[in-house]
Amino acid sequence: MTTPISNSPSSIPTVTVSTTTASSGSLGTSTVSSTTTSTSVAQTATTTSSASTSIIQSSGENIQSTTGTPSPITSSVSTSAPSPKASATANKTSSAVSGKITSQETSEESETQATTSDGEVSSNYDDVDTPTNSSDSTVDSDYQDVETQYKTISNNGENTYETIGSHGEKNTHVQESHASGTGNPINNQQEAIRQLRSSTYTTSPRNENIFSPGPEGLPNMSLPSYSPTDKSSLLAFLSNPNTKAKMLEHSGHLVFIDTTRSSFIFVPNGNWDQVCSMKVQNGKTKEDLGLKDLEDMCAKFCTGYNKFSSDWGNRVDPLVSSKAGIESGGHLPSSVIINNKFRTCVAYGPWNPKENGPNYTPSAWRRGHRVDFGKIFDGTAPFNKINWGSSPTPGDDGISFSNETIGSEPFATPPSSPSQTPVINVNVNVGGTNVNIGDTNVSKGSGTPTSSQSVDMSTDTSDLDTSDIDTNNQTNGDINTNDNSNNVDGSLSDVDSRVEDDDGVSDTESTNGNDSGKTTSTEENGDPSGPDILAAVRKHLDTVYPGENGGSTEGPLPANQNLGNVIHDVEQNGSAKETIITPGDTGPTDSSSSVDADADVEDTSDTDSGIGDDDGVSDTESTNGNNSGKTTSTEENGDPSGPDILAAVRKHLDTVYPGENGGSTEGPLPANQNLGNVIHDVEQNGAAQETIITPGDTESTDTSSSVNANADLEDVSDADSGFGDDDGISDTESTNGNDSGKNTPVGDGGTPSGPDILAAVRKHLDTVYPGENGGSTERPLPANQNLGDIIHDVEQNGSAKETVVSPYRGGGGNTSSPIGLASLLPATPSTPLMTTPRTNGKAAASSLMIKGGETQAKLVKNGGNIPGETTLAELLPRLRGHLDKVFTSDGKFTNLNGPQLGAIIDQFRKETGSGGIIAHTDSVPGENGTASPLTGSSGEKVSLYDAAKNVTQALTSVTNKVTLAMQGQKLEGIINNNNTPSSIGQNLFAAARATTQSLSSLIGTVQ
């Protein structure tokens, strides 16, 4: 039965294809018949093989190709019409394709022109020119009518080639000399496929008989040009015998390595319908690769292709489809990240039609799904050379077979954009490879780059869906698992893959799980530089999300603590306690902590999904919004594995951030609950209540829940801050850092829609993560506030105070200061407690003590002495000199235009690196570990003790007053507004002067 391809007008021919499988690895032969209403021509051609016409440099290997005895292959094209008829017949004795084919064109009118001769028909065809019209609906391929000529070249022991001559040029010479030949190239995709399928081949080691004799004279080994984005061009290129002589085989796939372009043409499983070109570049420098690296990358890709295709089609696609509530099959990942460093492969969304649309940007709350790519990192086999042969065509030219299943190979439904061929990118960065098959550009960086490669896979989807992945000899689509899918262009920037290796270690992780919370990174002097928060977060997440895929489809297990507790403990104490699974116990019920375990904080380990995206598209998605809070994933016994927190988070965010771009420039809108409440409810009850917008009502003001967003927004620290982006713009970034906390977006009425939390977060993270890669491999710098304070202030007050890097974290700023600035000085550390023999209990030890008969007051930075052990005595002369200038001998204040006391102290702090002027000593005289007062019968000891006591009291007073003065520069205002002897300013300086006198007395006594 012959079934038309589509309900096209009668002027469009009907094409039927007969395909049989030949022996010895042949991909089969095809007989094509066409019927139109215009003319009728039956032609059978006879040609012999010949060489092509120009020379190109080979890629360093001499590849020998042999062919067997050719068998006759006949192909007929018949038409019937009232016009005159003509026929031409010839015999074909080499393994080439003869005849011509007219194919169906859709969506645009197709015109066919044929020219025949009235006299004797020669062995070469007359010109037949057929305009090619693009197709965008149901036709699988863009076929073009061409004329083909063949010539003879002698076989002297090395190569026998099939040559396709130049297009549109009549050749009156049927046979010429051995070393030259002309003809018409095959531009018709179906014609090229028929020729390629008519060839059989065997493989042998690549270096076998490379020094065997070649043909006499100088054979023409030139290769034709091709377009990597046009499938028809690729097929015509591969059908050239010179090209076939240079093709290689690996793992059942056929490849042509083009060293001049740093690319390779890939024919998966020998299926010519799935041919595509892959551009390979260094991921960071965008430079082309050398031959060795190019072949290594090609071998790895060939080795893991079938494993990846099988795992995607059999496991990942059904899983993702069930979570999204859609029918499985035909869903491609937006991108695939292959990480050479951690030997993993992860595929990312979008998974549903809504997010795959052109006007929708997927949210940042999705996660990837790990896909098995096989053991491609344990070494790959070498390439094999291909020994080409030929196989006969079917004996009966009158038997024709047509495809009755519309949409399957070879007439698969083309994608929506036939004229634009998608580029599939494979990016190898930091030892990792990123395969980008969609419109998502995934960029990711790492602090320790090893090798970076990028592979660009270009296919022409005007004919077939070239993103169809299959593991067998596919007759159905291209690089896809089941059905067709939309393919779009995508380029990529430097990216780090946010994936997990076999041992569960992230690529930017500085320590393994057992060292979580420890100060692993060191400075030049070898001292630890700070707590490793990422390692602690990772260890906690590995415990509460034990799923095979990093828990992306499972809920968090109940534990003795949540992510908020872990981060808080590491920031405050330098390490976190061990996370222990406690069945039946869900841990603290305070929403402040439960929220911290929410969506995508685990992604912090690898700088989050959206880093480096050209279009700001995030990587992953667990479920759609309709399944929020439900236990969507199941284990092997069919029982639900846990609540789907990510879906609940996504649904809530879609409600309170209703903007076109995921609400990045809007809201959040006031609602009956916030993100903390949602996550808490899902963890506690398995589901969250519906989020309802309540105009006039704000979200919960409980600071615990607003700080909870730390977990989510820490993830934004790298993704939404734009680190690694090619254009420096994040997908959710609404404003620059200077506008942080402002109501930048406006609604229809022109009024601000809400505080811009993301901008404030971005500005804070840019300050505390100044590293080249967004600070992903560096600890955050100590500052006067953390991310939780930022979010809380913006939600409560509409703006956040300025983040200032400081050795100490501020003790809570007062935004109501005279100039609207919070304190830049850290809070004074609490007084240490020591056991004394006199009290035998906990008593406050003096901040200034005596060691070895010498008083030494040291400045402290983060609880330890600063390098060089700067003493307090170095500051005292500056203070005394300043006070002597501003006060007369009788104690009256003289208003000077010079620097103020606060400026002097601040300058000293900057020079020494001290966070504050804090007196401290290591030990005191007496028994070890005690603070024994210096009392005794000696009058000198008593006097010295009294002097030290006075100095301590004076230092405490002046320190408190200086700290107060520095907050908002109040000191200058007090002095300027109070000029009487009884003013507060005079009293303050009187106390400072008394302190100076006491200090001078103490220094003199000690010296």
From Swiss-Prot:
Keywords: Signal. InterPro entries: Chlamydial_TARP, DUF1547. Residues 167-176 have a biased composition (Basic and acidic residues). Pfam families: DUF1547 (PF07577). The keyword Cytoplasm does not apply. Residues 597-618, 712-730 have a biased composition (Acidic residues). The keyword Transmembrane helix does not apply. Coiled coil: none annotated. Residues 1-51 form the signal peptide. Residues 1-186, 200-224, 387-533, 543-562, 578-645, 655-674, 712-757 are annotated as: Disordered. It comes from the Bacteria. Residues 1-96, 423-442, 469-491, 619-635 have a biased composition (Low complexity). Residues 118-163, 177-186, 200-210, 443-453, 507-523, 732-743 have a biased composition (Polar residues). Belongs to the chlamydial CPn_0572/CT_456/TC_0741 family. PANTHER family: PTHR36975, TRANSLOCATED ACTIN-RECRUITING PHOSPHOPROTEIN. This is Uncharacterized protein TC_0741. It comes from Chlamydia muridarum (strain MoPn / Nigg).
